[in-house]
């Protein structure tokens, strides 16, 4: 599911009551996510298992995991997903609620249309929060544009260049599922994401 957002408010212009409401929804989602965790072994939980199987089908950086696994692992360890920015908190809320990976990129920072595909390797990429480049691997599945990679290993690691910031005005938000049986969950998650963005951003 894809949600394209235009005319986003700068974070500083979002009323404090809305910031607090979003934070409360994320807190609730951290609790709700526990229903997706039927095993203390992270890889044995159905949402994680489905993505682990998908990740075996393409070349990945060692240790790369789907973003929803990283979020659910925090919940499993009793370390709730923290508040970051209103926009990121919204998509993390939806991600935790439905146990589906949700990502977001700044459209204005993209060099061209975004595309998902197998790369020949060497695509420029600076991981979010890192000081050194980490180019893509040959045979890796990634999101990219004409300037390089946007998200490594499908939905594992976002890049600095197109990351959403407090000043972002246009956003590309995406929710993904590899389980056909969860089509209704994907549709519901997309609807909730669109509704929250429209209400708060």
Regions found by a protein language model. Name each.
Residues 1-201:
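Charge-biased, low-complexity intrinsically disordered regions
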